[in-house]
Amino acid sequence: MGSDKAAVWVTNWDTERNGSSLTPRDGTSYLLANAFMLAYDYGQPHIFSGYYYAGVDDGAPGATRTSVPDMTCPTDGIETAGTWHCAQRWTAIRGMIGFRNAVAGTFTA
C-alpha cells in the first residue's frame, strides 16, 4: 500500500483492550514503538490517547451515560488509576513529531 493511503498506529481504542498491541502499560516499549512509527516515513501516523482502565468495559474516568467531564492530561507518561494518558503531550513523542515534521519528504530505504 502506498504511504499516501496508509494510516499507521501502535494501538487504538480496540486493540489496547484486547491484548493484541502495546499500550501505555507497556512503558518504554510503547514509547519506543511510537517513536519508531514517527521516525519512519510511511503513512499518516496516529497517536492514541486514552485513559487508565481496570476492566475492558470501563468507561472514561468520571463519565456518565450522557457526558464525559473535562480532563487533565499528565505529561510524564505515568498512567495511574482514574487518569488519562495523553501520549501526544509526552516529551519524547512531542520531540519525535517535531523530528518527523523537520525531515518530511526525505527518502528512507
Language model: regions and residue ranges:
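Active-site-proximal substrate-binding groove within the catalytic cores of carbohydrate-active enzymes
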Residues: 1-109
